[in-house]
Design a protein with these regions (language model features):
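Juxtacatalytic substrate-recognition/specificity segment
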Residues: 1-99, 109-117, 121-129
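Beta-strand-rich interaction surfaces with strong enrichment in secreted/lumenal proteins
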Residues: 280-284, 293-298, 352-358, 369-370
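Beta/coil-rich, acidic/histidine-enriched accessory regions frequently appended to metallopeptidases
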Residues: 168-293, 310, 318-325, 332
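Glycine-rich, acidic and aromatic/proline-enriched surface loops and short helix-turn segments
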Residues: 101-110, 152
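Active-site-proximal alpha-helical
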Residues: 121-205
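Exoplasmic/lumenal beta-rich domain surfaces
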Residues: 325-371
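Extracellular beta-strand-rich recognition modules
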Residues: 305-311, 371
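Extracytoplasmic/secreted proteins, especially bacterial periplasmic and envelope-associated proteins
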Residues: 2, 70, 74, 78, ...
Length: 371
């Protein structure tokens, strides 16, 4: 009931027309996974054959055995995901994971500070991007701390406004701020939050720029602040989008000029189109489908008909798929086409037929016979 009062309600009675929420303990939750909520279980089995068709938590019986605190921690975290899915199914991971971490804290069951410590020791972590490879631990820490600052600054009632917003990320926060007639913007709150983290790291308590009733783990050896020489010099550095770098310039008394140059915008992708200036980008959003459709009149075509194209993809292997489909009846029915680099393997149950998954390793050419 407490989490519902803060974040909102899950789908209830939901897909199974049952008010109850179910939990399944199994030894096959996945390597290193304590538990999870799968949005697939909110689908009808006729749409998603692997759906359990109920509001369900999958919990690892081996890793959680004899550890009731960890069970409560995992359930509180995953319940926020279940609630968020009911209101804004494709919310970005930074907000969704941050709110789930906050759910742990609010029920007094956040068991580890390793996430926050990892972030504060290197705060140049994006608050708008989520990694597809490498460690996500500091991202969990950053997202939790920002969510905690939001709750402290605007009150717990504001959290539900963000959850209910169909817009994602900072756009959703801005929309929620307008709804409550706040004069803040998400960017302003981000700037305040970066100041709060710095002041906390320096041992300075400053009212609004601080966390309420919470003390994050201090970074070791002041590692969040980088020292620079005050002598006349220039240097190059990089920063993640909505990441933070802190610099210390110990200078003698006098007048100094600091000039900062940077890029006002960045490309969406790190790779260039295979030719020309443009390529079609499929977007990168949770629980979402993006498509491109074009009509061709092949009624007078003679001989072999081939569809040729270049593509480059980076997908979560076995869970996210890219398909090529054809309809010969105006879109009433669709047939998935087999391609040279695709697969019909479906261990996860997410492959709808024949698709690409994993990493392509760069641009490559595909040619499909449509005859």
């Amino acid at each position: 009931p407490f989490e519902r009062s803060v974040f909102g309600s899950e789908l209830s009675p939901g897909i199974d027309h049952d008010l109850r929420i179910h939990a399944l303990f199994t030894k096959k939750a996945g390597a290193g996974i304590l538990g999870y909520f799968s949005s697939r279980d909110e689908d009808h089995p006729q749409v998603s054959p692997h759906s359990n068709a109920m509001e369900l938590f999958i919990l690892d019986s081996t890793m959680l055995a004899g550890n009731p605190d960890q069970i409560t921690n995992t359930l509180s975290h995953e319940f926020q995901h279940m609630i968020h899915y009911a209101h804004d199914a494709n919310e970005g991971s930074n907000i969704d994971e941050g709110f789930s971490g906050l759910a742990e804290y609010l029920i007094h069951n956040r068991l580890s500070e390793a996430y926050e410590r990892s972030f504060l020791e290197n705060p140049d972590i994006s608050l708008t991007l989520w990694p597809v490879s490498g460690s996500s631990i500091p991202y969990y820490g950053a997202s939790f701390l920002f969510s905690k600052y939001l709750a402290d600054r605007l009150g717990q009632d504001f959290l539900n406004k963000v959850v209910e917003q169909p817009r994602n990320g900072f756009e959703g926060i801005d929309a929620a701020l307008k709804e409550v007639k706040s004069t803040f913007t998400a960017d302003q709150l981000f700037a305040e939050w970066t100041a709060a983290n710095l002041l906390y790291g320096l041992g300075i308590s400053n009212g609004e720029f601080s966390y309420r009733d919470y003390e994050p783990p201090l970074p070791k050896n002041g590692s969040m602040i980088k020292s620079l020489s005050c002598k006349n010099q220039s240097f190059d550095s990089t920063a993640m989008q909505y990441g933070t770098d802190y610099y210390n310039l110990p200078c003698d008394a006098g007048t100094y000029e600091i000039e900062i140059t940077g890029q006002p915008t960045i490309p969406i992708l790190s790779m260039n189109p295979i030719q020309g200036q443009y390529a079609w980008w499929s977007n990168s959003v949770n629980n979402s489908d993006t498509w491109m459709q074009h009509n061709f009149d092949l009624s007078n075509a003679k001989g072999s008909i081939r569809f040729e194209f270049d593509l480059n993809y980076d997908l979560e292997e076995a869970y996210d798929f890219l398909y090529l489909s054809l309809s010969a009846d105006g879109g009433k029915t669709w047939q998935m086409l087999k391609t040279a680099h695709g697969t019909d393997l479906n261990e996860s149950g997410f492959n709808l037929g024949w698709g690409w998954t994993g990493k392509s390793g760069g641009w490559f050419h595909e040619s499909v016979n449509l005859s």
